[in-house]
UniProtKB/Swiss-Prot annotation:
Topology within the bilayer: Peripheral membrane protein
Main location as per UniProt: Golgi
Superkingdom in the source lineage: Eukaryota
Protein name from the UniProt record: AP-3 complex subunit sigma-2
Pfam name, any one: Clat_adaptor_s
Keywords on record: Cytoplasmic vesicle, Golgi apparatus, Membrane, Protein transport, Transport
Source organism per UniProt: Bos taurus (Bovine)
Places the protein is found: Golgi apparatus; Cytoplasmic vesicle membrane
């Protein structure tokens, strides 16, 4: 099972942190820091697997990572996961990010955090691998993007609600609003208009 997914830059700044096991925030920060220091001091030509038992609390935990440009993608897994399978999963995740953001970079992970988390949830949920077919993942992301565009995006909803209320032409301000069993008395708002 995957215990955590960490993405941080060359300076140790976390860009994506996802734990699938509950830890207090201080412990999470310590795990990110120690993982960064373990991974940073390794040469690029050394194996991408290392023991991480003392970090997460068991002797059978491993850190599997890949270094792309300025980012380290680290998966903390237990002994039931295949190291090569997780290495391929990291590749699928990065290539999917690359397809969705057209040449993904560190700034995409910062400014589109919601989309990055959605992509990650298409790949891994609850520490279990859901999907490894990149075309299927991208199809789900595109379907989500179409849905958001058709709804005008959730972030635009409050502005649409305010403009809809402003555009209502009422001959006079209602004093009572009745909705089923609910009766709402409207105060005199003319002094505020």
């Amino acid at each position: 099972m995957i215990q955590a997914i960490l993405v941080f830059n060359n300076h140790g700044k976390p860009r994506l942190v996802r734990f699938y096991q509950r830890f207090p925030e201080e412990i999470q920060q310590q795990i990110v820091r120690e993982t960064f220091h373990l991974v940073l001091k390794r040469d690029d030509n050394i194996c991408n697997f290392l023991e991480g038992g003392s970090l997460i609390g068991g002797s059978d935990y491993k850190l599997i990572y890949r270094h792309y440009a300025t980012l380290y993608f680290v998966f903390c897994v237990d002994s039931s996961e295949s190291e090569l399978g997780i290495l391929d999963l990291i590749q699928v995740f990065v290539e999917t990010l690359d397809k969705c953001f057209e040449n993904v970079c560190e700034l995409d992970l910062i400014f589109h955090m919601d989309k990055v988390h959605y992509i990650l949830q298409e790949v891994v949920m609850g520490g279990m691998v859901l999907e490894t077919n990149m075309n299927e993942i991208v199809a789900q992301i595109e379907a989500q993007n179409r849905l958001e565009k058709s709804e005008g995006g959730l972030s635009a909803a409050p502005a649409r609600a305010v403009s809809a209320v402003k555009n209502i032409n009422l001959p006079e301000m209602p004093r009572n609003i009745n909705i089923g069993d609910l009766n709402i008395k409207v105060p005199n708002l003319s002094q505020f208009v």
